[in-house]
Structures are given as structure tokens and as C-alpha cells.
Amino acid sequence: QPLVQVQGKWIHLQQGAIEEAKRLFKDGATTTMPLVEALRLARGDGDDSHALSIGGLTSTGWVRELLESTSGNETLPEISQPPKFEGQLRPYQLTGLRWMAFLSKFGIGTCLADDMGLGKTIQLIALLQHERIEPTHLMGPTLLVVPTSVIGNWERELDKFAPEISVHIHHGPDRPLDTEFRDLVAENDVIITTYGLVHRDRETLNQISWHRVALDEAQYIKNPPTKQAQSIRSLKAWHRVAFPGRPVENRLVDLWSIMEFLNLSYLVPATTLQITIARRNEQLIGTAS
């Protein structure tokens, strides 16, 4: 193992750290990283698998604003009920709107897990209407993925609370694909489709850079290896939203799958999570015995 003397002190250097430092300086002493990795480092949650520790993180613009907001002193933006929203948001729903607008600004996935009947639907509709009045720095169509049984309900709720929002239902044997679908997306604010069709029409849906992908009854993707879950994770979107329809059941990996959809690669891989849980359980069993 290499030892070097620096200012009269011997320092032990790991080979992995040396190689990573050489690569960093070869690239010009700067590097880029995904936003989720920057968030980890800003919060002191860096990936221990990296041989070279990070001593500091410098950012500018809206990324700096986001990282500074993780200090615990952040405040939600002052947002009133959007004009032409045909309803009355309750105080907690207005808080939900502000929270989603804050996270959407930075492209951070949002899990809105209010109990059934508390109005998750209208909070998302209010966000869509808010963005029509005060568009963010990045706008585009929203893809809403729902169980087949609630397509009609979402269509009615959108028409009731935000009639200005144009909606297309991507469903049925005669649904448009490829160029025809892209033309329809350009003409509408919201595209509603089902979980099954996301996998079946994945090539068509992946041609679109969505502003937002929102999942109703998000427990439909609780099994990470399924083709359905993989297809939904592969969708390109600035902002991702999940509405879990029921409490987490049985396995922590069910929750992991939803969180992985919301913020890709922020958490450790599912296999690592399962190994960690297994080891922890073994330790608990050993302690108890």
C-alpha cells in the first residue's frame, strides 16, 4: 500500500483514490454529475463506493438555490388558488399545491400520499392550472397514467375543475401512434393512458419529452423487475408525481420501486437494499438470541 510524506507526515493513499483523482484532473479538475448525486453530496449522503471523498460542492443558478434549500430553512412559495380553477382548495390542499410547485421547479419527484378522499386529484389539477398562469422555466405536456377503471373519473374532474386544460385519452384499439400521436400531444395539455399501454406503446410514448409523468394508484409499479414498472421508469420527464393508493404492504422494496420512479438512482439499487435489510435482520436475530 502506498505511503507518501506530506509536510513531514506520512499519509496512506488507497489505490482507488489515486486513480479517481487522476481521472478527475485529466478531465480538467472539474466534473459534472446528475442532480440527484449533487443532492446526496449537499446533504452529506455521498456514495461510499467512491474511492475519493468530496471535500466541497460549488453550484450556481437554480441548482445553488435548490441545494441551499436543503438546509432546513426553506419556505414554500407563496401561491394563491389559481385563477379559473373551478373549485375551492382547502388549506391543506393549498399547501400541497405549493409543495408540488416547489419540487416541480427543480425537477424533484413528488409522492403525494394523502389519505383517500382528501383530494389528491384536485391538487394535481390545481398545479396544472397554476402552471398555465405562471409557467415554469420548462413546460410541456403531462402524461397521466391511471388504472383503466378511473380514466373517466380523471377526464370528468379535469373538465370540472380546469375546463381550459385540453385532454386526450390514449386508449382503445384505434388509438394513434407515432407521428399521429406526437401531433395530438402537441395540441393537448394532458394525455391520459393506462399502465398496460405504457409498456405496449413504450416506443411511441418514449418519443416525447414529457414535462410531467404522474401515476395514480402508483402501487401498480411496486414490483421493480416487471416490464410494466421498467417501461414507466424509462419515460423521459422533467417532473414525476406518484399517488400511492394504499399503504405499503409487506415489502420495503415496494416503496423503493415508487421512490426509484420519482427520482431515478437517488436511492441505492434494490439488490443493495435487500442485502442491507437481510444483514440487519440477521444482526437483530443474533442479538435477540
Language model features by range: what are they?
Residues 55-285:
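ASCE P-loop NTPase motor core, strongest for the SF2 helicase catalytic module
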